[in-house]
């Protein structure tokens, strides 16, 4: 069977194109050798399950590994510590019962089977007996035992699970005297060390953690450009497309920042839809992805509903160019980072990747489309702004300036400074909707300057949106925009200046530098 790109469940190298995670596994193995208990918390579809699967295979020569998941457990299993203990032992049995010709495993099978038979009628194991079971298992086996539990988020709000963790913690602290697991690894989205952490101010027991013994696995689990290129090399060896592997890997990572699901999803779309392994194919895949309803975006929407403070944070960054100093003690920033929506860069908060950013823009702008005059205006004049498959950007900016001054000219300056760029996003959205995409260059997203890049039918348009701060500041902005044009190999750029000087000159002007030019429109 031919290999394919995988976006669901565990990745298997014989079935799927996947990156090399051997370095990641070796780092976890070193922690296990040191007897560390470990937490792996990353966003949804970040490769946690695949990591645990291949870790178990890597460890099986020197350890007895029980890899279980709470994903399929229903609430009945968490009814009490006794029912949860029984469910854990039962899952351990399911994992080990078919393994043969292994003395250490045979010993473990006997202890587990005897325990289940003893308590099978009530399907409950008292906590003290569960503790004895762990000690007997770890003492009698010929190899150290590692327990990994995936999808622990499903259990995080049950007191029964917290009590089980307290038991494991107690045994860890007394392991010099009482046999216990060599290592326990808990994987999920939420940081299990802050099990009760919530964003809402009325949340209680926020730091009631029974798991402060564990070390977080901090190594980067996103795909580097090198890893993406290695995966594409495997694909190219099979399909002979003639792609420029380094260039394609770089472009994919520009959109995804290496988020595993997003990298694999774009590759899958290009492959299955025959979009072409080139810049245009990637842009087309991005457009398709942003229109999809899938589990990844469903989870994003749910998180925004469940955590309105995070939605406000992301909106402030994207809409208003607000900057935030990254502080891990801030609960909103902590949780947003835990979901992999933001990350820390040089002490500041950044949106994690361009795909998430573009989807967030779509969400936020969609909330306002129906009532937005700017959106209606852009939709009304859409046919005038497209000619022979190209955007007539000069005309778009000129018309927006007229519209903005007509509708918002009487508003307060502070209102316009905060809102102007958002209105332009609403204005441009119906013009390019269904055909193009746009995103904001993260390094320029601040209160005074924002660079918008529009991809439309294979052509890029760069618009610098900024607040007028005087002639010298404006000249620096022009110089920076010319540098961007060089970087993107584009000869024409655009500048949209929001000026509150009553003596401003609203007519568009053209600034030239060699073969390149900038059209500036003042609003």
Question: Residues of each region from the PLM?
Answer:
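Mid-core helix/loop region of P-loop NTP-binding domains shared across ATPases and GTPases
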Residues: 94-149, 153-160, 169-181
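Active-site metal-binding core of divalent-cation-utilizing nuclease and nuclease-like domains
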Residues: 430-458
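Conserved NTP-binding/hydrolysis module of P-loop NTPases
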Residues: 65-66, 71, 75-110
């Amino acid at each position: 069977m031919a290999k394919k790109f995988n976006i669901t469940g565990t990745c298997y190298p014989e079935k799927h194109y996947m990156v090399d995670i051997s370095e990641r596994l070796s780092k976890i193995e070193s922690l296990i050798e040191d007897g560390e208990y470990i937490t792996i918390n990353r966003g949804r579809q970040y490769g946690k399950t695949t990591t645990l699967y291949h870790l178990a295979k890597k460890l099986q020569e020197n350890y007895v590994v029980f890899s279980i998941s709470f994903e399929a457990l229903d609430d009945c299993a968490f009814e009490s510590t006794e029912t949860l203990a029984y469910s854990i032992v039962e899952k351990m049995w399911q994992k080990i019962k078919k393994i043969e010709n292994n003395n250490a495993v045979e010993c473990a099978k006997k202890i587990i089977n005897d325990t289940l038979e003893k308590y099978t009628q009530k399907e409950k194991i008292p906590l003290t007996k569960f503790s004895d079971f762990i000690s007997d298992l770890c003492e009698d086996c010929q190899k150290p035992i590692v327990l990994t539990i995936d999808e622990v988020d499903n259990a995080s709000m049950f007191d029964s699970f917290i009590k089980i963790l307290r038991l494991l913690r107690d045994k860890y602290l007394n392991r010099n005297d009482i046999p216990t697991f060599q290592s326990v690894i808990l994987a999920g989205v939420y940081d299990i060390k802050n099990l009760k952490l919530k964003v809402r101010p009325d949340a209680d027991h926020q730091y009631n953690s029974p798991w402060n013994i564990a070390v977080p696995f901090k190594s980067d689990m996103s795909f580097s450009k090198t890893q993406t290129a290695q995966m594409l090399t495997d694909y190219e060896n099979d399909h002979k497309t003639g792609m420029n592997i380094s260039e394609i890997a770089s472009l994919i990572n520009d959109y995804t920042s290496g988020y595993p699901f997003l990298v694999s999803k774009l590759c899958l779309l290009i492959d299955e839809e025959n979009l072409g392994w080139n810049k245009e194919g990637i842009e087309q895949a991005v457009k398709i992805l942003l229109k999809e309803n899938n589990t990844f975006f469903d989870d994003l929407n749910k998180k925004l509903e469940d955590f309105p403070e995070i939605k406000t944070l992301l909106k402030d960054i994207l809409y208003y160019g607000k900057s935030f100093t990254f502080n891990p003690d801030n609960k909103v920033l902590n949780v947003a980072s835990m979901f992999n929506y933001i990350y820390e860069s040089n002490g500041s908060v950044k949106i994690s990747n361009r795909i998430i950013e573009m989807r967030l823009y779509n969400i936020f702008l969609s909330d306002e489309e129906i009532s937005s005059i700017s959106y209606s205006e852009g939709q009304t004049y859409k046919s005038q702004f497209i000619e022979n498959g190209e955007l007539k950007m000069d005309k778009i900016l000129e018309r927006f300036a007229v519209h903005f001054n007509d509708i918002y000219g009487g508003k307060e300056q502070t209102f316009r400074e905060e809102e102007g760029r958002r209105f332009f996003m609403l204005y441009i959205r119906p013009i390019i909707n269904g055909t193009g995409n746009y995103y904001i260059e993260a390094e320029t997203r601040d209160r005074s300057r924002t660079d918008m890049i529009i991809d439309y039918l294979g052509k890029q348009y760069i618009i610098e949106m900024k607040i007028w701060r005087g002639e010298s500041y404006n000249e620096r902005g022009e110089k920076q925009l010319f540098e961007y044009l060089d970087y993107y190999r584009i000869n024409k750029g655009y500048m949209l200046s929001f000026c509150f000087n009553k003596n401003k000159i609203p007519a568009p002007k053209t600034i030239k530098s060699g073969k390149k030019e900038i059209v500036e429109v003042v609003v």
